[in-house]
């Protein structure tokens, strides 16, 4: 049912919104299309400590809404807001998504989780 909402002709101009809720550690960004929740991202800002990037703990698009560019749109929105996003080296799905967007790792950071390295992907 939700998928049909996005398949209307372009002349109907479907309203999209991203609503942000602050948490103690960072933010939760919820994406809505035509009033329906279609996805969310949870961003940890406590790891950044003043640096121009954020750790994206979660990026989730409802299964029936995937393949329509909503995850890409949410990532681009976060890139405009935060600059860069950090991705764990064992998160292959996120790394593939960033690489499909034409982004590559430009460094290794032993940041926040000292015993783990994080590949940093610019998504702007």
Show where each model-derived region lies:
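Conserved GNAT acetyl-CoA-binding A-motif
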Residues: 80-92
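Conserved acetyl-CoA-binding loop of GNAT-fold acetyltransferases
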Residues: 101-108
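Conserved short alpha-helix immediately C-terminal to the canonical SAM/SAH-binding motif I
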Residues: 74, 93-97
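Acetyl-CoA-dependent GNAT
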Residues: 3-53, 57
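A short, internal acetyl-CoA/4′-phosphopantetheine-binding micro-motif in the GNAT/acyltransferase core
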Residues: 57-66
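A structural microfeature
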Residues: 37-39, 71, 107
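Conserved acetyl-CoA pyrophosphate-binding loop and the N-cap/start of the following alpha-helix
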Residues: 65, 69-77
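C-terminal "cap" of GNAT-fold acetyltransferases
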Residues: 29-30, 89-92, 109-124
């Amino acid at each position: 049912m939700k998928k049909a909402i996005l398949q209307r002709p372009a002349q109907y101009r479907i309203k999209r919104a991203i609503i942000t809720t602050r948490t103690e550690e960072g933010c939760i960004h919820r994406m809505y299309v035509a009033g329906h929740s279609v996805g969310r991202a949870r961003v940890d800002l406590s790891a950044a400590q003043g640096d121009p990037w954020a750790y994206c703990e979660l990026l989730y698009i409802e299964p029936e809404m995937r393949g329509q560019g909503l995850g890409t749109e949410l990532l681009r929105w976060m890139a405009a807001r935060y600059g860069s996003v950090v991705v764990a080296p064992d998160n292959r799905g996120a790394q593939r998504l960033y690489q499909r967007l034409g982004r590559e790792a430009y460094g290794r950071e032993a940041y926040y989780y000292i015993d783990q390295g994080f590949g940093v992907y610019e998504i702007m």
